[in-house]
Amino acid sequence: MFDNLFKYNVEFFSMPELPEVETTRLALCEILLKEKINLVNVINDNLRYKVTRDFSLKVKKKSVLKIERKGKFLIFFLSQKLAFIAHLGMTGVFRVEKKYKPQKHDHIMFRIEKYFVIYNDVRKFGFFKLDSQEGIYQSPHLKHLGIEPLSTELKTSLFVKLINKKFQDIKSFLMNQRFIAGLGNIYCSEILFSAGISPLRICNEISHIEAKKIVLSIKKVLRRAIKNGGTSLQNFQDPNGKIGYFSNYLKVYNRTGKICLRCKKNARILKLIIQNRSTFYCKKCQK
């Protein structure tokens, strides 16, 4: 059942965002939890940060206790109070095989009792960082991240406080990982369309009712994306053999010139650039 568990084929529309990382986490949990890592083979250490020899030596023979996610980061908790961060960068993917079949751009291979778990990264922007369990959340990669969008902490009252004195556009605010962790270009466009809010709206001009719509849309869009295996991943098969693409449910992202699914014949989706990133919206129904 787990042969070629991750059938990504390394095709991305964009950097993996929270739903793609969460989908990866859930799949890895099926394979790795309570398993001992018998071998760590660093095939190519050339990632964003070079994989140290220390990483291989310390991770080897440790058991995987749990795998968490913070924003777009995976956090592996191991036995003997060790932990490490994994970030997928632009094109990082894991695959699982019963027999290791080398592929171009393989970087790290983890050997457990029945399977090989391989990290592959074409563009080499991903990385792995070893730390202690006690210190992992104080890592410079994690300690400045904002709140988790799917947590109970994200409520309308808190969101209003966050945007109250911000003079930037709402799209840029949502993209800022220091405020809310894990949102990226695809989901920010989808969230704002769902909420009926223009990406150009200035934060401190957004009403309490509009803020509530954004918060509800954040949770709704992300949960639906996770349920459908994410957007950026192509040909993804989860541990139950289900294949699904959230790209089938995109309302605005990458739909420039197409008819708005809310307004029907009366308006088309526009594309504009905000902070060097493509942004998609309907000028008629997003105010």
Can you say where each PLM-predicted feature lies in the sequence?
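Intrinsically disordered, low-complexity repeat segments enriched in small/polar residues
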Residues: K7-F12, G230, Q234
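Catalytic cores of large soluble enzymes that bind and process phosphate-bearing ligands
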Residues: P16, E20, S151, E210
